[in-house]
């Protein structure tokens, strides 16, 4: 008889829940709920379990915020809860709450070739460290290492490292953003809001007044080639994505590959392919040869957060991935 676990991927707006086959890792019965409609995460879980009538005693839910202890307070939502109390209330034997990019990193061993698009480099080296990052509402970062037949995710807040420009144009961007924001992290330029900041900085550096644009507006105008400033912003975004990925590769020697997740890049995939992304990735001066063979992949799986939550839980329960 198939045994299922509950898996989830929770952001600031929506909570996506599903069932995971503990033996195979297969994800099924996925459903998305609006977080605005429920007073707590536990309430959403109860609705899902009532709707599906499956006996579940184990769960793993990925959440877009730092997980540092039993108390979880979402940074982009009003939900806050005790993991131990929620586990007790639901009657679960196991309940894991993990960072969203921990989940994405744990999905990588489960991905198939059709879930990936490669951008340069050679083949990944088996057993070597892996980096994963992705731009969305913010900039998520994680690493993955293989130790004693187990995958270990190394979570952190790498998106908040300093923005490190490496060209005259990028230096001008930093100057403009520092005047507006004070501290300028990588996330301030590599995210949806970051694309807007890039556009604004480009326009303001030319002593002009920027329009009040949303990330979608900038992307659409760039792809239509109807706005030079928007196209420059999107081009710069791609190059800086490359530089940041190359930095991750250097930090941990990620010869197992660098993986890009998040919802932004797939929206302009052809533009990204033709951009200066790979050039930015390899632009490491004396260490260019070190990163040249490291492959970069774009994850095109529909929901790596659910897949990775399931993988994390299965490994916790003693399975080998």
UniProtKB/Swiss-Prot annotation:
InterPro entries per record: ATPase_NBD, Bacterial_glucokinase, Glucokinase
GO terms for MF: ATP binding; D-glucose binding; glucokinase activity
Protein name per the record: Glucokinase
UniProt keyword annotations, A-Z: ATP-binding, Cytoplasm, Glycolysis, Kinase, Nucleotide-binding, Transferase
Coiled coil region boundaries: none
UniProt GO BP: glycolytic process
GO CC annotation: cytosol
EC number per UniProt: 2.7.1.2
Disulfide bonds: none
Protein family: Belongs to the bacterial glucokinase family.
Species: Enterobacter sp. (strain 638)
Location within or outside the cell: Cytoplasm
């Amino acid at each position: 008889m198939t045994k299922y676990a509950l898996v989830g991927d929770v952001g600031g707006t929506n909570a996506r829940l599903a069932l995971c086959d503990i033996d195979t890792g297969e994800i099924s019965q996925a459903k998305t709920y609006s977080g605005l409609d429920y007073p707590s995460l536990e309430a959403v879980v109860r609705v899902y379990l009532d709707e599906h009538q499956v006996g579940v005693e184990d769960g793993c839910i990925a959440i877009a915020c730092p997980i540092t202890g039993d108390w979880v307070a979402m940074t982009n939502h009003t939900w806050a809860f005790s993991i131990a109390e929620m586990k007790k209330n639901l009657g679960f034997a196991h309940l894991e709450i993990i960072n969203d990019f921990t989940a994405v990193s744990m999905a990588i061993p489960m991905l198939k070739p059709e879930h990936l698009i490669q951008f340069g480099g050679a083949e990944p080296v088996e057993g070597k460290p892996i980096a994963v990052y992705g731009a969305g509402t913010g900039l998520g970062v994680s690493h993955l290492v293989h130790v004693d037949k187990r995958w270990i995710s190394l979570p952190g807040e790498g998106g908040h490292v300093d923005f490190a420009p490496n060209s005259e144009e990028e230096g001008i961007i930093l100057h403009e953003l520092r005047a507006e924001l004070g501290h300028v992290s990588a996330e301030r330029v590599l995210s949806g809001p970051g694309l807007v900041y890039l556009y604004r900085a480009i326009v303001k550096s030319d002593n002009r007044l920027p329009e009040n644009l949303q990330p979608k507006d900038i992307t659409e105008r760039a792809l239509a080639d109807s706005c030079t400033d928007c196209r420059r912003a999107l081009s710069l975004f791609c190059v800086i994505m490359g530089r940041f990925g190359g930095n991750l590769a250097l930090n941990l020697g990620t010869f197992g590959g660098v993986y890009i997740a998040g919802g932004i890049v797939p929206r302009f995939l052809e533009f990204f392919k033709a951009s200066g992304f790979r050039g930015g990735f390899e632009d490491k001066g004396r260490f260019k040869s070190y990163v040249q063979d490291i492959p970069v992949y774009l994850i095109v799986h529909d929901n790596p957060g659910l897949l990775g939550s399931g993988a994390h839980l299965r490994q916790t329960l003693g399975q080998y991935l």
